[in-house]
């Protein structure tokens, strides 16, 4: 089974239409990977589905980088 980091990066690449090797931990979804506000909402929804968790809006707003997404999932996984 893939690690959480690998799974998050795969989702980010799929949702934002970028190559997986472009998705590194320090990358910002908006500034580095070209996401817009709709992309970030869809990305959060994909993360919720993949990891079977609910991410409240106030928490979702803080998830702006690949590492932030990884950290959130790690700290909230069942």
Curated annotation (Swiss-Prot):
It holds the Pfam family PP-binding. It comes from the Bacteria. It is found in: Cytoplasm. One of its GO terms (biological process) is lipid A biosynthetic process. GO terms for cellular component: cytosol; membrane. 4'-phosphopantetheine is transferred from CoA to a specific serine of apo-ACP by AcpS. This modification is essential for activity because fatty acids are bound in thioester linkage to the sulfhydryl of the prosthetic group. The modification O-(pantetheine 4'-phosphoryl)serine is found at residue 37. PROSITE patterns: CARRIER, PHOSPHOPANTETHEINE. Keywords: Cytoplasm, Fatty acid biosynthesis, Fatty acid metabolism, Lipid biosynthesis, Lipid metabolism, Phosphopantetheine, Phosphoprotein. InterPro entries: ACP, ACP-like_sf, PP-bd_ACP, Ppantetheine_attach_site. The keyword Lipid metabolism applies. Residues 2-77 form the Carrier domain. One of its GO terms (molecular function) is acyl binding. Its main location: cytoplasm. Pathway: Lipid metabolism; fatty acid biosynthesis. NCBIfam families: acyl_carrier, PRK00982.1-2, PRK00982.1-3, PRK00982.1-4, PRK00982.1-5. PANTHER family: ACYL CARRIER PROTEIN, CARRIER DOMAIN-CONTAINING PROTEIN. Carrier of the growing fatty acid chain in fatty acid biosynthesis. Belongs to the acyl carrier protein (ACP) family. This is Acyl carrier protein.
């Amino acid at each position: 089974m893939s690690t959480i980091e690998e799974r998050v990066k795969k989702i980010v690449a799929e949702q934002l239409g970028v190559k997986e090797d472009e998705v590194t931990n320090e990358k910002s979804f908006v500034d580095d990977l070209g996401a817009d506000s709709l992309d970030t909402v869809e990305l959060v929804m994909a993360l919720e589905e993949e990891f079977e968790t609910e991410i409240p809006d106030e928490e979702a707003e803080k998830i702006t980088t690949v590492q932030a997404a990884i950290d959130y999932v790690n700290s909230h996984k069942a």
